[in-house]
Amino acid sequence: MTQFPKTVMLLGSGELGKEVAISAQRIGCHVIACDRYADAPAMQVADQAEVLAMTDTDALLATVRRHRPDVVIPEIEALAVSALAELEQDGITVIPTARATAVTMNRDRIRDLAAGELALRSARFAYAASAEELRAEAPALGWPVVVKPVMSSSGKGQSVVDGPDGLDQAWDAAMAGARGTSPRVIVEEFLRFDLEITLLTIRQHNGETLFCAPIGHEQEHGDYQCSWQPAELSSEQLHQAQAMARTVTQNLGGVGLFGVEFFLCGDEVIFSELSPRPHDTGLVTLISQNLSEFELHLRAVLGLPIPSITTADAAASRVILAQNQMDAVSYTGVDTALQEPDTQLLLFGKPTARPGRRMGVALARGEHLAEARAKADRAAACVRVLQR
């Protein structure tokens, strides 16, 4: 029988980490939130906070060893991943595993695993370690192509390139948006897909794997803009997606929730990417499911039962973005937005803003997806981010 309180340390304290912290505290956990800047969203609700350079191996090891948490939950990609393996050797549980975190934070490693070792369907791709290599590799994939850093988040450094003349600019953008030290990009064929989906996949201590209803979403420059649940898939498409998600998450191992992304192209389901943690497109589950992705993650991590996952008939989310650079923020239009029935707002509490930064999300339910999406869109459009 699981005994509480458990001590949970979050490595990264953004909006997703904040919801994980809240879910952990609801079941009696002590939460320590870590990030590179003070007053990050999860720190605002945590029991303790630590500010440190998250990519500094020595600083990360010292911080975790000082607290000796029961579990360490990485919430961001920009981490000293080599420290996670050392922590596992110390007997500290890393979620889902140190290896899974290391593999999935690098597009080349997860693509080599999924498309190579596991033979999952993916877009055709190549790697390039210089602008010259990029110019050599891209034409064989056909135009347009998508160029991405092997390590980045929230779409940073991604470009769609229509022809050879745009490759040097795409290389420069990838290097500017990259995290880590690898001067390498992945270049992919551009898929003319019908839909992008996220399949939230939950691995439990008892060995069982559960799935949430698929979530449809739209991206702009590689960054999530809106999502809806349930996405409409045929039974065969759902079977393909679940089989691929089960295969790749079983290989990665560990427990917890994974966000597995796919493209739907006609009848084909094509693997895209994977996050070993709650997914931004899954914010919709705060209104769509009886157990949100954050609650599911905590239950799986701590070995607690998940009797059932139920989903509303139609629910949607729409992000709220900042338009300007601000060193302190306030909001208007909240009262207007909440006049929409069956609608909620989630303002993340980020202390500063910059153009395009995600500051919140509107969530809505409806009788059908078109209604839910329209409600979320209207509510999000009401909210303005202002200098305080």
UniProtKB/Swiss-Prot annotation:
Family matches, as InterPro entries: ATP-grasp, ATP-grasp_carboxylate-amine, ATP_grasp_subdomain_1, PreATP-grasp_dom_sf, PurT, PurT/PurK_preATP-grasp, PurT_C, Rudment_hybrid_motif
Pathway this chain belongs to: Purine metabolism; IMP biosynthesis via de novo pathway; N(2)-formyl-N(1)-(5-phospho-D-ribosyl)glycinamide from N(1)-(5-phospho-D-ribosyl)glycinamide (formate route): step 1/1
Residues that, per the record, bind Mg(2+): E261, E273
Entry annotated with the keyword Ligase: yes
Binding residues for ATP: R107, K148, S153, S154, G155, K156, G157, Q158, E188, E189, F190, L191, E196
Source superkingdom: Bacteria
One GO cellular component term noted in the UniProt record for this chain: cytosol
GO terms for MF: ATP binding; magnesium ion binding; phosphoribosylglycinamide formyltransferase 2 activity; phosphoribosylglycinamide formyltransferase activity
Residues the record lists as binding N(1)-(5-phospho-beta-D-ribosyl)glycinamide: E15, L16, E75, D280, K350, R357, R358
Reaction it catalyzes: N(1)-(5-phospho-beta-D-ribosyl)glycinamide + formate + ATP = N(2)-formyl-N(1)-(5-phospho-beta-D-ribosyl)glycinamide + ADP + phosphate + H(+)
Keywords, ordered alphabetically: ATP-binding, Ligase, Magnesium, Metal-binding, Nucleotide-binding, Purine biosynthesis
EC number assigned by the record: 6.3.1.21
One GO BP annotation of this record: 'de novo' IMP biosynthetic process
SUPFAM superfamilies xrefs: Glutathione synthetase ATP-binding domain-like (SSF56059), PreATP-grasp domain (SSF52440), Rudiment single hybrid motif (SSF51246)
Function field: Involved in the de novo purine biosynthesis. Catalyzes the transfer of formate to 5-phospho-ribosyl-glycinamide (GAR), producing 5-phospho-ribosyl-N-formylglycinamide (FGAR). Formate is provided by PurU via hydrolysis of 10-formyl-tetrahydrofolate.
NCBIfam families: PRK09288.1 (NF006766), purT (TIGR01142)
Family classification: Belongs to the PurK/PurT family.
Assembly with partners or alone: Homodimer.
Protein name in UniProt: Formate-dependent phosphoribosylglycinamide formyltransferase
Source species: Parasynechococcus marenigrum (strain WH8102)
UniProt lineage: Bacteria, Bacillati, Cyanobacteriota, Cyanophyceae, Synechococcales
Primary gene name: purT
